[in-house]
Regions:
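Conserved cytochrome P450 K-helix E-x-x-R motif and the immediately C-terminal K′/meander segment
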Residues: 17-36, 302-341
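Cytochrome P450 heme-thiolate monooxygenase catalytic core
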Residues: 69-74, 92, 108-272
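N-terminal membrane-proximal hinge/A-helix region immediately C-terminal to the signal-anchor transmembrane segment
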Residues: 1-95, 111-122, 142, 154-158, ...
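Short, small-residue alpha-helix embedded
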Residues: 269-282, 412
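Conserved cytochrome P450 K-helix/beta-meander segment immediately N-terminal to the heme-binding cysteine loop
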Residues: 353-380
Length: 450
């Protein structure tokens, strides 16, 4: 066996960058079909390898995770997220993860059900049968308000929600695949760079306002007992971070980085997962009818305890995230020279772990492009290769907000499903890649009476 993995031939100077930037999803699918488990790509100055076998995913994310760190893909990511939990490494990451853990304890997450349902019902009060809503936009607004309440311990008004949403678009555009970014520095006074810098500054202002609102209150005073889960002190993330700052464990920059990470990562992925779920249910009337019957059987507004009575809703959400994973590929960097599937992977190489490819592969799923929620039924679970599904990552660095995101998504689905019928009235999906996978167009949903 050659020690160099196979891969597609690139263009002079641009390598595979132009093909990838035109349609990353079609490109990843095509090269996976053509070249197998380990694929060499030419996407920039670093050696890049795409891994499409779940067993290699398990190695990189779980069994040998310490040998594969988070890469610095773009200085703009540092400008946006800094040294927050998503991007930090080593002792810094361990410190921040340990600090944040109480905010994501299962008991605390379950106690957020009233806030999730309350915000959802507030949103529904502005909807009427016959309305045609952009479901992606509406869900993004809703999940911004929910994440601020859940993790910042406060609420924000409609104007602040609008400000956040308006400034997410230039951020998303900045991270869309573009081979020319390799030669255009972030400090260059291009229109895109200026819009990105302005958006970051505006969002940092929103964060600073939220912090100022809470700073110095009784809830953020230092607790001599520390931030244990059973502490009488508030366990929202902002309170925890402010108490840590009072103890000298966090700087102002640390605080901002963590809160920016949570504001952006904590709402976008959930809103997108729900957008694709409503879209898929609209395309499959039988599944929608089963979903509606299940949520109608609840005795009143859904609670965290009710989720165990919503097995089909859980399957629907899992299947939506399989077909349309909001995070469509993970990136890691090899910290050492190593071998994967017999191929040499040099230190410093960039590794792509594409959920988009693995989730949709006929190697791991029967009829992989079909929407089949019952593939997640217990009697079929053993059919699946374990790491053929990883919408939240896996291993020690899996998404810390996974359980909250799932609770939030299922409660929103149940609340909306009990209130309205819905039908998608838009065009065929045109997907765009950025930090997340999002539709490149509005997602109109027509509401009707149940």
């Amino acid at each position: 066996m050659s020690t160099r993995p196979p891969g597609p031939r690139g263009e002079p100077l641009l390598g595979n960058g132009r093909r990838y930037s035109r349609d990353p999803f079609a490109f990843m699918t095509a090269v996976a079909d053509a070249y197998g488990d380990v694929i060499r790509l030419d996407l920039g100055p670093r050696e890049t390898y795409m891994l499409t076998n779940p067993r290699d995913v398990e190695r990189v994310l779980v069994s040998d995770w310490a040998a594969f760190g988070k890469p610095n893909l773009d200085d703009a990511v540092d400008d946006l997220l800094g040294d927050g939990l998503l991007m930090s490494e080593g002792d810094r990451w361990r410190q921040q993860r340990d600090l944040a853990n109480p905010a994501f304890h299962a008991r605390r997450i379950a106690g957020l059900d009233d806030a999730v349902v309350g915000h959802t019902e507030d949103a529904l009060s502005g909807w009427e049968a016959g309305d045609r809503i952009d479901v992606q936009l509406e869900l993004a607004r809703l999940t911004v308000r929910i994440i601020v309440t859940a993790m910042f311990g406060t609420d924000i008004g409609e104007e602040t929600v609008k400000t956040v949403q308006e400034n997410l678009e230039p951020l998303g555009q900045r991270f869309e695949p573009n081979p020319m970014r390799a030669v255009i520095p972030n400090w260059a006074p291009t229109r895109e760079n200026r819009q990105f810098d302005d958006a970051v500054a505006t969002l940092e202002g929103v964060i600073d306002d939220l912090v100022a609102r809470r700073r110095g209150t009784e809830e953020t005073a230092s607790d001599p007992a520390g931030d244990a889960v059973d502490s009488p002190m508030p366990m929202d993330l902002l309170s925890i971070l402010l108490r840590a700052q009072n103890r000298g464990e966090q700087t102002e920059g640390d605080l901002r980085d963590e809160l920016m990470t949570m504001l952006l990562a904590g709402h976008d992925t959930t809103a997108l997962a729900l957008t694709y779920t409503f879209y898929l249910l609209s395309q499959h009337p039988d599944a929608k009818a089963r979903f509606q019957a299940e949520v109608d059987a609840l005795d009143g507004a859904p609670t965290a305890d009710d989720l165990r009575d919503l097995p089909f809703t859980d399957r629907v959400l899992s299947e939506a995230m399989r077909l349309y994973p909001p995070v469509y590929t993970l990136f890691r960097e090899s910290k050492v020279d190593t071998r994967i599937a017999g191929y040499r992977i040099p230190e410093g190489s960039l590794l792509m772990l594409p959920q988009w490819v693995i989730h949709r592969s006929e190697r791991w799923y029967d009829d992989p492009l079909a929407f089949d929620p019952d593939r997640w039924a217990p009697d079929r679970a053993s059919e699946r290769e374990r790491f053929a599904y990883f919408p939240f990552g896996a291993g020690p660095r899996h998404c810390i907000g996974k359980q909250f995101s799932l609770l939030e998504a299922k409660l929103i689905l149940a609340t909306v499903g009990r209130a309205f019928d819905f039908d998608y009235e838009g065009s065929e999906l045109d997907l765009r890649g950025s930090l997340t996978m999002h539709p490149g167009h509005p997602m109109p949903l027509r509401l009707s009476e149940r």
